[in-house]
Amino acid sequence: MEAFKEKVERLFQKHEELITRKNVAVEDGNGIFTRYKYPVVTAAHTPVFWRYDLDEKSNPYLMERIGMNATMNSGAIKWNGKYLMVVRVEGADRKSFFAVAESPNGIDNFRFWDYPITMPEDAIPATNVYDMRLTAHEDGWIYGIFCAERHDDNAPAGDLSSATATAAIARTKDLKNWERLPDLKTKSQQRNVVLHPEFV
């Protein structure tokens, strides 16, 4: 039977091979965009130590403890010479969190930062957050606008899946420390919002 340490090393080796795999264009493109063979970020790109308890005593069979279902709908920005995405990472429980993945070229070699984003709550806590869009604003802040989903209090008793959606707003200077601002107030549920990078 393969030793625990060797299994861990193999997990990290496979992960590194995935992250450093060169992406290749699959068609000439139309001059506007180029399609590539591999998705730039998948659930398998999330760090091994997010998904696995690497302690042999508490996880002797090296079972994945925190399942990652998918990565999707990222907001992207070129910042300090790197391509960064705030990725929606969906867990096996279908709840999402945000994490930053960084690449030198925006095509491959996307590597997640060590820790997911810790997003402060609004006055009314959200049951789920997703689909952040980033804007580097002329005021010096990077703004993230995303969907904050909350339980719908008008749903019938026992209905735990009905939800309301609002455009939540947060800002940061470093993509690590975030300040939560009040949600955008609208008459109807609105989460598809654009913030211009300069004052109009």
Predicted regions and their residues:
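Beta-rich carbohydrate-recognition and catalytic domains
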Residues: 1-73, 77-127, 135-200
